[in-house]
Amino acid sequence: MKRLENQVAIVTGGGTGLGRGIALALVAEGAQVVVCGRRQAPLEKSVQTIQLAGGEALAVVADISDESDVERLVQTCLQGFGKVDILVNNAAIDGGGSIHTHTVEEWDRIQAINLRGPFLATRAVLPIMRAQHHGQIVNISSESGLEHYPGDGAYGVSKHALNALGEYIQRENQELGIRVNTVCPGMVVTEMTQNSPGLDHSKCLYPDDIADLVIWLVTRRPNIKIGTPILIQTMENPWT
């Protein structure tokens, strides 16, 4: 029996890159998966890839920062698969630039996707997980959520806040068998980063590296808790 047999997972930002890699890894372990994102075509590609591998998946076009879209996402999961066991808050947008150069609109959009989105998704699944006395939430943050890189302010602030959100949710729900973990990757080669000038791909992480860690987190013994965000990096500086 596969380790996630009969488990149902939602992966936000599941149409490309890291999200697709995590979704495929969950399916390989037996989970049924709902992927969501803002673009139909990449989501359909993820579902097609999963189905060709013999898995089950649904796609939901949704803006993770929109409350009604998030409610529709969770309801689609319940209607399709009957429950929610795992939530992976992966959807995010980048936003380089110093704090003083950001427009209010840029700032608000970054916080909306990177922080409000995980809050809304988590709030939507927690009543389900609390009622069933089990559930796992994995937040995909960033090394920028642990460091303070100049020129990365709005994004970094959103990820620092996401780390804190995860710790609060863990402490508020652990007595009901709900685990919350936060993963802080270094530079990952994805659609968003692959054309970055000066980036040496051989010294970067790849989606499978993060997916492997997520699988370990959601398949370890139930009584094991990770107390702090997990930093995962390569051994070398990827910037040339």
What are these regions, as identified by a protein language model?
Residues 61-73, 104:
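The beta1-alpha1 cofactor-binding region of Rossmann-like NAD(H)/NADP(H)-dependent oxidoreductases
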Residues 15-17:
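Conserved glycine-rich cofactor-binding loop
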Residues 175, 182, 199-238:
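C-terminal helical subdomain
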Residues 142:
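Residue(s) in the substrate-gating loop at a strand-loop-helix junction
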Residues 31-45:
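Conserved glycine-rich Rossmann-like NAD(P)H-binding loop of the short-chain dehydrogenase/reductase
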Residues 98-99, 106-108:
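Substrate-binding pocket helix/loop in short-chain dehydrogenase/reductase
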Residues 122, 158:
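Active-site helix of classical SDR
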